[in-house]
């Protein structure tokens, strides 16, 4: 059984801030969002957690191993260095989507994301212990993306094909299994999953092929932290690439960096 700790990171009152006292320059906003995500990623990475940019004003992190004090330290650091603050809600559940729902509710019960009086909420449940089977992470990519798309199409049409595959994949995993999937650049998607057998991943790859005619491959890893499970998934994906298989499950967590 998996046990996933998910943290929602929400910029407080961000929409109104972007247009007060007048609309801010778009590239300034994009730079702010990118820097904030990079700083949060640098905070999470050494602690073996993952964070995904999602919509940038709302980021989703897999934080197994991080306690309330670590979350408070992140919140304080952002408040000291940025013109915006963040609220953090954390939930724990077997299915990642249920953990996220719990995290969302914690913030929503405190008020609207655009309520100027609702700032720096810090709430949630945190795992007190971790186990090697707590997390299952799958790393997908497109088979021969360079030969099929990058070297043949213009970049925007390549991007559209990747987006089609991502949309089909993420909806299927969300609706069928309560997994959370995130585009992480290039042709890569990382999915945080409940306890799924190999056949479920084969079915997922087949669904995307049938739905949008794009061939995926996936490596799957387990671990006590997002890094541990994700790194095992990377190694399993390399086995797919080397052996020409569509699904590979890591036998044991990859502990190196």
Curated annotation (Swiss-Prot):
Q: Does the keyword Hydrolase apply?
A: yes
Q: Which keywords annotate this record?
A: GTP-binding, Hydrolase, Nucleotide-binding
The enzyme's main class, written as a single word, is hydrolase
Task: Return the similarity comment.
Answer: Belongs to the archaeal-type GTP cyclohydrolase family.
Question: Which reaction is this enzyme known to catalyze?
Answer: GTP + 3 H2O = 2-amino-5-formylamino-6-(5-phospho-D-ribosylamino)pyrimidin-4(3H)-one + 2 phosphate + 2 H(+)
Query: What EC numbers are recorded for this enzyme?
Result: 3.5.4.29
**A biological process term (GO) from this entry:** biosynthetic process
Kindly give the InterPro entries that the UniProt entry links to this protein: GTP_CycHdrlase_3, Nucleotide_cyclase, Rev_trsase/Diguanyl_cyclase
Provide the protein name.
GTP cyclohydrolase III
HAMAP family of this UniProt entry?
GTP_cyclohydro_3 (MF_00608)
Does the keyword Mitochondrion belong to this entry? no
**An example molecular function term from Gene Ontology annotations:** GTP cyclohydrolase IIa activity
Which Gene3D superfamilies does the entry link to?
3.30.70.270, Nucleotide cyclase (3.30.70.1230)
- What job does this protein perform? Catalyzes the formation of 2-amino-5-formylamino-6-ribofuranosylamino-4(3H)-pyrimidinone ribonucleotide monophosphate and inorganic phosphate from GTP. Also has an independent pyrophosphate phosphohydrolase activity.
């Amino acid at each position: 059984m998996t046990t996933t700790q998910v943290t929602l990171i929400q910029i407080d009152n961000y929409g109104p801030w972007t247009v007060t006292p007048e609309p801010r320059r778009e590239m300034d906003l994009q730079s702010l969002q990118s820097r904030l995500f990079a700083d949060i990623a640098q905070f999470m990475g050494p602690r073996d957690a993952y964070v995904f940019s999602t919509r940038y004003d709302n980021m989703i992190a897999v934080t197994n191993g991080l306690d309330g004090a670590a979350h408070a330290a992140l919140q304080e650091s952002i408040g000291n260095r940025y013109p915006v603050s963040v609220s953090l809600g954390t939930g724990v559940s077997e299915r990642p989507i249920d953990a996220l729902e719990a995290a969302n509710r914690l913030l929503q019960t405190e008020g609207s994301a655009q309520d100027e009086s609702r700032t720096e909420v810090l709430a949630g449940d945190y795992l007190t212990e971790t186990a090697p089977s707590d997390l299952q992470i799958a790393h997908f990519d497109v088979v021969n993306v360079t030969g099929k798309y990058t070297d043949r199409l213009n970049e925007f049409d390549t991007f559209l094909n990747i987006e089609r595959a991502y949309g089909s994949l993420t909806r299927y995993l969300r609706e069928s299994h309560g997994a959370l999937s995130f585009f992480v650049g290039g042709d890569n998607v990382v999915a945080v999953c409940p306890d799924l057998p190999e056949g479920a991943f084969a079915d997922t790859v087949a669904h995307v092929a049938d739905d949008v005619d794009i061939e995926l491959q996936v490596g799957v890893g387990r671990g006590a932290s997002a890094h541990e499970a994700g790194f095992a998934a990377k190694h399993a994906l390399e086995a797919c690439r080397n052996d020409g298989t569509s699904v590979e499950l890591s036998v044991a967590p990859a502990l190196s960096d």
